[in-house]
A protein has these predicted regions:
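Short glycine/serine/threonine-biased micro-segments
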Residues: 27, 98, 167-169
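Conserved small/polar residues in nucleotide/adenosyl-binding loops
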Residues: 205
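Charged, low-complexity, helix-prone segments enriched in Lys/Glu/Asp/Gln
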Residues: 44, 63, 145-163
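Glycine-rich loop/linker segments at domain edges
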Residues: 2-91, 176-194
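Extended lipid/amphipathic-ligand handling interfaces
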Residues: 7-9, 199-202
Length: 206
């Protein structure tokens, strides 16, 4: 979608995030095809802190009308969470570069801990459950993250020696999103919503 996003992120020198600021200029196109005044509150406003324990956050969105096609028509996604996830993950990557930290470790340092659930984000969204640290460690182990970083360093060294022109990029992301129309309490104007939460037991019964 045609989004212009500006952000600021505050953190301590050791990488602990202390605050997040975001402003979005969102192109609606010639008219709002969604006819949904809760679209932004249900999506971008509340989920852009991602999977991270950020104590203070602010988000502002300006919706503008232009001579383009209606916003969101050509691109299917659930309630703008794609842009929200892209925003916070880019901020994390930039912070890692600024602090000289490994991007995976920076994420792990700031994940919401399992003992913090149910968790309410700085923007008022309630996360019912999760264990991000275990999921993250399993994912890194599955792809041999340490091995990939070692290979990346070797290629950089070989590039500097003029032995290769091929470098290795490593992309990381960890996101939390809402699904469906979102919790009822956040869709009061629209007058609709879906299940606020559910549990699955070991027999896979919802």
């Amino acid at each position: 979608r045609d989004y212009w996003m500006k952000g600021k992120i505050a953190a301590t020198k050791d990488g602990k995030i202390t605050g997040l600021w975001c402003h979005v200029t969102a192109d609606h196109g010639a008219f709002d095809a969604c006819a949904d005044p809760t679209k932004f509150p249900a999506g971008f406003f509340h989920i852009c802190t991602g999977s991270y324990d950020i104590p203070v956050a602010y988000v502002g969105v300006d919706g503008v009308y232009t001579n383009k096609a209606p916003g969101g028509v050509a691109y299917r996604c659930s309630f703008r969470v794609t842009e929200a996830a892209y925003f916070i993950e880019r901020m994390i990557e930039i912070l890692a570069i600024e602090l000289g930290m490994d991007a995976a470790e920076l994420r792990r340092l700031n994940f919401i801990r399992a003992d913090q659930f149910p968790y309410q984000s700085a923007l008022g969204w309630e996360y019912d459950s999760g264990d991000y640290h275990i999921a993250w460690d399993k994912a890194l182990k599955a792809v041999d993250y340490a091995g990939l970083r070692a290979e990346q360093a070797d290629r950089v060294a070989a590039f500097k020696r003029g032995e290769t022109r091929k470098l290795l990029g490593i992309g990381l992301t960890h996101f939390t999103e809402i699904v469906g129309a979102g919790p009822v309490k956040n869709c009061d104007i629209l007058g609709m919503g879906m299940f606020d939460s559910c549990e699955i037991d070991r027999k896979s019964v919802v």
